[in-house]
Amino acid sequence: MYEAKENNGNVIEAVDLVKRFGNFVANDRLTFSVQRGEIFGFLGANGAGKTTAIRILCGLSKPTSGQIRVAGYDVYTRTEKIKQRIGYMSQRFSLYEDLTVWENFRFFGGIYRMKSALIRERADQMLGRLGILELSDAVIASLPPGIRQKLAFSVAILHKPEIVFLDEPTGGVDPVTRRQFWEMIYEAAATGITVFVTTHYMDEAEYCNRVSIMVDGKIEALDTPEQLKKTYNAGSMNDVFLKLARRNEEQMKE
C-alpha cells in the first residue's frame, strides 16, 4: 500500500477513504489518484457514493477514515486551503437564481478575493466566448437550463482553480447542450485545470482521460476508457459497467 504524498505530480491522492453514516458504508476503502491536468471521471449509478466522495474531496464533509490529500493539503486539517484552490459545481448548477448573471460572477469572485476589475474582465471574456455577453444583466431564473449550466461552470473556474469538481453537471439538459458542455471542459483542461467529474451517463466516460467505476460504494475498476473496454471485452463503457454490476451482484449472492 502506498501513502498519500504531496509532491508527486498528483493533485488528488486518496488511500482507503471510508465514509460511514451509522451502519451504512457510503464509501468503502476508495484508493485512487488524479494526475495534474487530467479529466478524471467518477462513473456510477445514482446512489453509488460519488457525491459523498466529491464532498469529502472538496472539504465539505469529513471522511470516517483514510489518507486524503487535495492540492497538496490534508482534508482533515486544511479544508480552507483546499477550498481556495478548487472550483465546485453541484448538481443544481450552483448559481443564485434571484441574482443577475453579472451579480453571480461578482459574488463568487468576491469569495476568492478577486479584484472587481479582474472579475469584470474574466466575466466578459467568458460571456463573450459563450456568445451571451448581452445577458449579463439577465436574472438567472429567467434563463434556460442549458445557459445556466454553462454559466455555473464559468463561475466555478472564474478564479482559475487548480482543480474543478463537477458533480453530475449535465443532468437535466439535452444531448446537444451536453456535448457543448464537454467542449467547455476540454477547453478548461487545456489551460491546465484538473477536472474531476461525476456522472451516471455511461457515454460521458468516453470523454475522460481515466475513469473510476463505482458500484455500491466501492471502486470496481479504474483505467482509461479504451483499456477498460479491452479488459472486459466490451464494446462500450455501458457494457463495462453492466458487467461489473452483474459481477458484484453474483459475489453478494455467494
Language-model-detected regions and their locations in the chain:
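Hydrophobic anchor residue at the start of the ABC signature
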Residues: 153
